Amino acid sequence: MKLFGSSGIRGIVNKEVTPELALQVGLVLGSRKKTAVIGRDPRVSAPMIEHALVAGLTAAGCDVTKVGMVTTPTLAYAAREYECGVMVTASHNPSEYVGIKLWNPDGMAFDSAQQEEIEDAIENENFLRVTWDLIGKVAENGNAIRDHMDLIEGLVRDSKLRVVLDCGCGAGSTITPYLLQELGCQVITLNSQPDGHFPARNPEPNDQNLSLLKKAVVAFEADFGIAHDGDADRMMAVDEKGNFVSGDELLAIFGRFECGDEKGTVVVPVDTSMMVDDYLEGSEIIRTRVGDVYVAEGIKQYGAIYGGEPSGSWIFPKISYCPDGIYAAAKLVEIVREKKLSELRAELPVYATKRGAFPCANEKKAELMEKVKTKLEPLGKVLDIDGIRVELENGWVLVRPSGTEAKVRITAEAREKVDEIYEMAEKIVKEALK
């Protein structure tokens, strides 16, 4: 039984992720943990899944503390006082999706071994149902957001920048506007009222979805703009000229400021630009599978200073192994206080990148990748820890099945003629899909 993808359990509500499944996850988790903290993002289905999880946890004898609607990094930080954390979220996915993500007390998402243990236990119904006098207690804690803010404010310097913030009607609305104000910023908010229908824009904070933010940054003459996804584990940015800052650019900028003159180790996924390697020359760059849990595992394994994903997940191990879009927003304020974001971008090497995605049923992904590997292997050095990445003379290409959606993704990067590399991979994928 395979339930976990690259970002926990996730799927369409009442089809792939149901109250029955949530109940089973709760029973298995509650059979192995004595205490748990649970939170949720604003999506419409989140309370239903949360109730089912709480029922399962308490039925197995686990005491549960509910922190309400919070961001994923807030929940992961709250988990430090419990044996585990449970977050109901589908992150950047649309309204019809819901998911469950599990956290260890150090802010690390459940690793592969822990995920497999839960999958096996559900399949074999290996869980407890305690007697009435041992049922777990349910409590509420309203301090999780304040605690997270206090942590960040103790690490980041104040600034008087003007910032436009687009929370995308997600959970970031509960914390980021207030945090930046307390750090001295003048904050202009967009879509900062939680709404699980995500009426303003798609929750994913990519270039295509942030047209309003880009216009607002210019109109209000702001120093830069910030955007979150549905649960604010992600953070993306727009410079003062209204230009979207790519994930690879932010990854490199954060890496430079975290490493400083000491260099160090930085962990990134296989789909990361070679720009990061060149800009962080002298630092060791470790590549992992795509997914924040794998990046976090790499950070822990190699004792890295920092790690992140171009999708907008930034992990700062000095505070947590959870991607923290809230801390990243505050950290970027501190960085831009010293130099404009457009000037920082101008320092970066520029390579052409092209990305695309094609529908592919989950059950057909393995067969597809075998066909793709056969075609790509003769072309160059292969890294196959997650999909197939081939190093070419002029760049590289990665073909990788999505861990959260029924898609296969292509990423190509080159010093020149990126279209040729992309189209070559596209042709191979399309033929394999027939």
From Swiss-Prot:
GO terms for biological process: carbohydrate metabolic process. It catalyses: alpha-D-glucosamine 1-phosphate = D-glucosamine 6-phosphate. Activated by phosphorylation. CDD domains: PGM_like1 (cd03087). It holds the Pfam family PGM_PMM_IV. It comes from the Archaea. The modification Phosphoserine is found at S91. Keywords: Isomerase, Magnesium, Metal-binding, Phosphoprotein. The keyword 4Fe-4S does not apply. Catalyzes the conversion of glucosamine-6-phosphate to glucosamine-1-phosphate. Belongs to the phosphohexose mutase family. This is Probable phosphoglucosamine mutase. The gene is glmM.
